């Protein structure tokens, strides 16, 4: 039986209807089978850069940037023997013959997608088991294939896993996972938020709405892990995922289309009109000046509408500039204008606006330590919004026309090449809707 009465229509990234009258809970991370697959595969999937390993060994470039160890060069035809190596990796990683282990060659064997069996994830305390097991299997497969002796085995290890375990992360490694090691988490339950925005953008091949969707799915699923989306707050997060992340009722698409030649301000005007029309808000009182103060008929739904408007405003503004740097100020001043225009709270009840203040400073103000693409929901600057700010950053980086020093191509090439091979990572809107269709009559 459904807990919530809300029904939504789901549209794709091109504004095409996918399914209608879908119960809100059908897109819940706890019930939707596609989101379940995404979360499971995020934890069990590892990208292995065989071309990188081969090049690293050939030059003895080991352990990270500017590190060379003359005399430790190994000239091994790793890519040429990718199929043999992949078979050996699968045999070592696999637990049972018919389990869900998957080892797939990409780009003619230059990269591998290694998905460890789910049983390894279930029987481990944390998700780093996938990187460690895939890395160990890759090391052994290379040693066995080329009969590497005991004196050069450590060189192979360093080419694969980098400086680990001297470092807490995998500095200089040629294996990569979406999820960073748990020791880097800012707080409990932040694992799914600890994914670079650029990783998400590269995985969705810079499709704006799909990038925002994947970001929203990961962010909002994390809210269920941290305890934020429990009880009285569950519906707030489900509606946020639906309207901002999954383009429910085609709201984001409609707002962008209506304001294709507009500004952040015109998006806000369109949003307020739509919210009144859909009976989400109403006029509370009118001042002598004619200024109208609004109140929500449905607080959680208003937040979802405001979040959808925030994404639309980001797309309109950054899309006009084709430069992602303005995303922080867009998130900030969209909320500022919205609050002044309506008398209502901004997205995430002020947390998105507050996040944007720090985000502006640390992404391009006096400090300017890094572009928007290297931020994530676990970052000390952008962690404060409960899942509503980062989807806008993903959209902005998808629209960027190469202005960023930290571009998806530079920071996330391997992750993008490998993870984009998984259909429901590349096109989450479509596949989450399909998952919802499978279960909607059971709710």
Swiss-Prot record:
Provide the reaction this enzyme catalyses. coenzyme B + methyl-coenzyme M = methane + coenzyme M-coenzyme B heterodisulfide
Q: Which UniProt keywords apply?
A: Methanogenesis, Transferase
The record's listing under SUPFAM superfamilies reads: Methyl-coenzyme M reductase alpha and beta chain C-terminal domain (SSF48081), Methyl-coenzyme M reductase subunits (SSF55088)
User: So, what pathway does this thing act in?
Assistant: One-carbon metabolism; methyl-coenzyme M reduction; methane from methyl-coenzyme M: step 1/1
User: What does the entry list as the binding residues for coenzyme B?
Assistant: 369
GO MF, one annotated term: coenzyme-B sulfoethylthiotransferase activity
Pfam families for this protein: MCR_beta, MCR_beta_N
Q: Which residues bind coenzyme M?
A: 367
Report the cofactors: coenzyme F430
Q: Bound how, and how many: what does the cofactor note say?
A: Binds 2 coenzyme F430 non-covalently per MCR complex. Coenzyme F430 is a yellow nickel porphinoid. Methyl-coenzyme-M reductase is activated when the enzyme-bound coenzyme F430 is reduced to the Ni(I) oxidation state.
Q: Which GO terms describe its biological process?
A: methanogenesis
EC number of this enzyme = 2.8.4.1
Q: Which family does it belong to?
A: Belongs to the methyl-coenzyme M reductase beta subunit family.
Q: Per its database record, what is this protein's job?
A: Component of the methyl-coenzyme M reductase (MCR) I that catalyzes the reductive cleavage of methyl-coenzyme M (CoM-S-CH3 or 2-(methylthio)ethanesulfonate) using coenzyme B (CoB or 7-mercaptoheptanoylthreonine phosphate) as reductant which results in the production of methane and the mixed heterodisulfide of CoB and CoM (CoM-S-S-CoB). This is the final step in methanogenesis.
Assembly information from the UniProt record: MCR is a hexamer of two alpha, two beta, and two gamma chains, forming a dimer of heterotrimers.
Tell me what this protein is called: Methyl-coenzyme M reductase II subunit beta
Annotated organism of origin: Methanothermus fervidus (strain ATCC 43054 / DSM 2088 / JCM 10308 / V24 S)
Query: Which gene underlies this protein?
Result: mrtB
